[in-house]
Amino acid sequence: MRYQRPKGTADILPGDSEKWQYVEATARAVFKTYQFKEIRTPMFENFEVFSRSAGDTSDIVTKEMYDFHDKGDRHITLRPEGTAGVVRAFVENKLYGPQVLKPYKVYYMGPMFRYERPQSGRLREFHQLGVEAFGSESAALDVEVIAMGYNLLKTFGLTDLKLVINTLGDQQTRDDYRQALIDYLEPHFDELSDDSKERLHKNPLRVLDSKAPEDQQFVADAPSILDYLSPEAQAHFDQTKTYLDALAIPYEIDATMVRGLDYYNHTIFEIMTHSKALGKGYTTICAGGRYNGLVKELGGPEVSGVGFGLGVERLLVLMDAENIAVPTDDQLDVYVVGIGDTASATTLKLVQALRAAGYKAERDYLDRKPKAQFKSADRLNARYTMTVGETELADQVVNLKAMATGEETKVAMADIYQDAHQVLDK
């Protein structure tokens, strides 16, 4: 039997893993400047955490979640997105209390799981970077989160970016708009897709998110939520636009954008890019928004939140397509060449001493001839070689060679053990 990875998953091998490390390290550095700190939550949660947060009619809950009953008959779900687990942790650990500074800012990174058709940059096990900020209803925080996502993508070298925003308003806005949508769509009920028929009276806003061809003409002509904003919702949206203008971040407004999760309200946004690597036209690379009711939905008090998620696989596909070079630090500092069996213990001691001093060091483990060892040093792009043979052992020295110049010197082993930096950093 041939064992293969499950469909929709990927092995991240050396050569690629360095790109992931770069993305994660860069994101951490950017998040740190905004005073966001890392949170780590379980990769699986109780089913209700996601069914309550994402919405019973969302594609995630109805079609895409990996859920099962464990041996204790608990209904468990592999996390399909990051926000709900973070909100659950926020509530369970009482981080909404007055003893915790607000806004409470956290970021996460790690694998998520959705049962969907694998395609370029979209897998069943995929990885997200995300941020969440709790405890402020200010539109300035919405814009800070948007700016952070926008600047992060620019830091990665992406240039053809488009920010699209919308508002889902407050509860009054959504109640009024919900009824307007039902009134508009009901006469066309028989022409809607099966999914949209099912959603029409449960959550008509989900119809606007439909990708079914038969729904597109109705989505295009649907009433605009912008015509149903309450004064408070209008003021929040106006402030958001004012702050974006102040930061000189260009944006477009798409009144049909609703996002794929039911917990959003007020500001929602998507940052898109135009790349053939992800298909025709603009595709979303980073998305998020405000969710003022989610903390209460998961058992906490009325505390507002705002955040975004960013797909790492899609980001890396884009970076490859744009030929964006990822900085690497894979040069070996020292390759220790051993000649003869008697040198083996000494070469092992030398590489350990070099590593303890902070250098990247390697030796041979295949009992090869010196010529083959020097070839390995070349392939590993070593800065130096240290050669130890019978003569060097007798004199307790190594033959140190600078690979760039070919210059060779004799160095006492004691000097290396005592202070390798004095030897290598002259």
Swiss-Prot record:
Its EC number is 6.1.1.21. Signal peptide: none annotated. It catalyses: tRNA(His) + L-histidine + ATP = L-histidyl-tRNA(His) + AMP + diphosphate + H(+). GO terms for molecular function: ATP binding; catalytic activity, acting on a protein; histidine-tRNA ligase activity; transferase activity. The keyword Repeat does not apply. Keywords: Aminoacyl-tRNA synthetase, ATP-binding, Cytoplasm, Ligase, Nucleotide-binding, Protein biosynthesis. It is found in: Cytoplasm. GO terms for cellular component: cytoplasm. Its main location: cytoplasm. GO terms for biological process: histidyl-tRNA aminoacylation. NCBIfam families: hisS. Belongs to the class-II aminoacyl-tRNA synthetase family. This is Histidine--tRNA ligase. The gene is hisS.
